[in-house]
């Protein structure tokens, strides 16, 4: 038993360390710790979404591939002409990248699949609880949210919502970091009001429909 516990514990610890590292990287990206990196991701995402709003996805992908090929082919021809003029033999300009190992190992794939599967199973379980009314209040919240989304969908399309989502994702963390105390205060007030209303609703429900005590 002692021999098998070692590899398992090291596998779990390495997986948790990897998840923490990726979480910190995303946090740094959203909080603009590296302005250049965050700006590139934000700008690239916005350009892609705005392109999808104006053109079809097939056109956007085609233009992206053509742009990339234009850059790489032009650079390849330029280096070849330069080597011919200077009579040098530096080889293929992209040789270091071509020789770089970009294969996905089975271990990395298995770790990513395991982590994703845990989130998927949790989401499926929660969705089943909502649709089968395990908690009436939570199911009513979902119904209210979907009813509001029908009005949102009548005004905005999916791409517009994604653009707004990206804008909020890259601006809300900075605003929260700057006005954390004030925002936490108002969020606490709203949470207290929602909790009070929820408790009143649950108190008026029949016993079989009340939220199960854990």
From Swiss-Prot:
InterPro entries (alphabetical): Reticulon, RTN1-4
Name of the protein in its database record: Reticulon-3-A
Residues that span the membrane, as ranges: 46-66, 155-175
Biological role: May be involved in membrane trafficking in the early secretory pathway.
Keyword Endoplasmic reticulum attributed: yes
Highest taxon above the source species: Eukaryota
Membrane topology term: Multi-pass membrane protein
Domain named Reticulon: residues: 26-214
GO biological process, one term: negative regulation of amyloid-beta formation
Gene Ontology CC, one term: neuron projection
Keywords per UniProt: Endoplasmic reticulum, ER-Golgi transport, Golgi apparatus, Membrane, Transmembrane, Transmembrane helix, Transport
Stretches of the chain forming a coiled coil according to its record: none
Assembly with partners or alone: Homodimer.
This protein's record includes keyword Endoplasmic reticulum: yes
């Amino acid at each position: 038993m002692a021999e098998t516990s070692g590899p398992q514990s090291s596998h779990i610890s390495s997986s948790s360390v990897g998840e923490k590292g990726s979480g910190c990287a995303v946090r740094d990206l959203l909080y603009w710790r590296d302005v250049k990196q965050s700006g590139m991701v934000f700008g690239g995402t916005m350009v892609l979404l705005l392109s999808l709003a104006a053109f079809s996805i097939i056109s956007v992908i085609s233009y992206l591939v053509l742009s990339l090929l234009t850059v790489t082919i032009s650079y390849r021809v330029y280096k070849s002409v330069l080597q011919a003029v200077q009579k040098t033999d530096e080889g293929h300009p992209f040789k270091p990248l071509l020789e770089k190992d970009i294969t996905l190992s089975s271990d990395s794939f298995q770790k990513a699949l395991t982590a994703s599967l845990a989130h998927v199973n949790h989401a499926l379980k929660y969705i089943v609880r909502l649709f089968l009314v395990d908690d009436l209040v939570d199911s009513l919240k979902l119904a209210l949210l979907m009813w509001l989304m029908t009005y949102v969908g009548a005004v905005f399309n999916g791409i517009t919502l994604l653009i707004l989502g990206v804008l909020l994702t890259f601006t809300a963390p900075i605003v929260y970091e700057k006005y954390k105390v004030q925002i936490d205060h108002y969020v606490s007030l709203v949470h207290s009001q929602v909790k009070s209303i929820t408790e009143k609703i649950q108190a008026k429900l029949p016993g079989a429909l009340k939220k199960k005590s854990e």
